[in-house]
């Protein structure tokens, strides 16, 4: 099997002190870039998609293409549901072959978040599907969900301990100062809070909103317990920017096989950098 659960790769990362990158993809070309680059660098890989991505491309198509690419490169990977909110939707995608899930109930009150997450864990663990959940809220935009900065909430360390114990999740996404989208100013990550969470929680910790973070912040976060790093916006900007530039310079261009090449090359450089920042080259 080339489509695997994220549980084992995150535990290995936790034990060996690096992080696994989770790259958000949208179509054939972006899938090709992340799988090919990870395979060339022998890096563990999580291919992530939001509900919007799976609606756009089709869950069966994403799983099938990811499986074929993984097989052709002899490179097992996890296909991951990013920021999913409904158990019925998760059940459908697990049935289609997904083996890694993030259930996001962070917008609910604490007790309701626990109840929702536990229902997903109880279902997914029957099928060896790993489950990530979020406690605290990141600012910014993910799919059609927009969280204003004033509504962003940092993860409370003691609540994190209770949350993990009561839900049985495999990994915990925490809020320590990152945000979805690009930063207008350099973010100030709360590393002290991260340390306090790590002291209370033994599951792998996840950092969302890593696009544009300085390498030093990613490296320090990993040294303090982050085991999975999510990148989305930075990939889209590199891909679309190179595509726009090519079409501006070649107004007559009409062949996707030509104008997708520079877009993929630009995105590949971001993937390579993130893998280097995560310290996971050669860790497959």
Swiss-Prot record:
The active site is at 82 (proton donor). It catalyses: D-tagatofuranose 1,6-bisphosphate = D-glyceraldehyde 3-phosphate + dihydroxyacetone phosphate. PROSITE patterns: ALDOLASE_CLASS_II_2. It comes from the Bacteria. Dihydroxyacetone phosphate binds at residues 181, 209-211, 230-233. It is an enzyme of class 4 (lyase). GO terms for molecular function: tagatose-bisphosphate aldolase activity; zinc ion binding. Its EC number is 4.1.2.40. Keywords: Galactitol metabolism, Lyase, Metal-binding, Zinc. Belongs to the class II fructose-bisphosphate aldolase family. TagBP aldolase GatY subfamily. HAMAP family: TagBP_aldolase_GatY. Forms a complex with GatZ. Catalytic subunit of the tagatose-1,6-bisphosphate aldolase GatYZ, which catalyzes the reversible aldol condensation of dihydroxyacetone phosphate (DHAP or glycerone-phosphate) with glyceraldehyde 3-phosphate (G3P) to produce tagatose 1,6-bisphosphate (TBP). Requires GatZ subunit for full activity and stability. Is involved in the catabolism of galactitol. PANTHER family: D-TAGATOSE-1,6-BISPHOSPHATE ALDOLASE, D-TAGATOSE-1,6-BISPHOSPHATE ALDOLASE SUBUNIT GATY-RELATED. This is D-tagatose-1,6-bisphosphate aldolase subunit GatY. It comes from Salmonella heidelberg (strain SL476). The gene is gatY.
